[in-house]
Amino acid sequence: MGVLSDARIIEKIYDESIIISPFIYDHVQPASVDLTLGKKIKIPNRIENAVNVYDEQQEIYEEREIEQYTLKPNDFIIAFVRETIQLPASISGFVKNRSSLARVGLDVSASSYVNPGYHGQMTITIKNMNPNSVVIHSGMRICQLILVDVEPEANIDYSKKEDAKYQEEKGGEVAKLYLDREFQEYNRLKDKGSISNFFEQRLRDNEKSIDDILSDEQKRNLGLK
């Protein structure tokens, strides 16, 4: 598994096995591609109660369209990259903060990983770690995408997963933990009890060896039999 160089990135974009649109040639670095900040952001509102990670999060955020935005110290926002990205089953990606932005105290993250088969406008989070306010601008280069070979290619890439919560996202998506498979199972129970106890029991019930999980055909396809 190797990181794609600028030459291989250009090659993959040329043959359309990777799509980055709009594509700016000057944004290709020696082993990454710079991505730019979109116009819409979501700002968390202060609420009385603690945020439950399994609640729907839409009402917590105020959506705003920006040309520029001032992040005060410790401010946190959800944003998205302007580019639409599509990766094949043979390539995954890592999103990293730009060094220049880190030096002014901005922490930019996209949960750092992009699955093979992903398609959409990536959501990113931005936090100001600077003791001073920092101004950001739509269209500025906000993060870098590092592309990596997946060998052999993913058997079930992100586009084929039934629970791919962020496939085809249009940017600025809030957390969708309430769609996690295990939480959906918990919600279907008549006698729910403690969610932590349910998760612990589920882990015990589903713990199996890889030999028990794979069918003979799957083992043959993976070269294990």
Where do the protein language model's features map onto the residues?
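DUTPase catalytic domain/fold
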Residues: 1-225
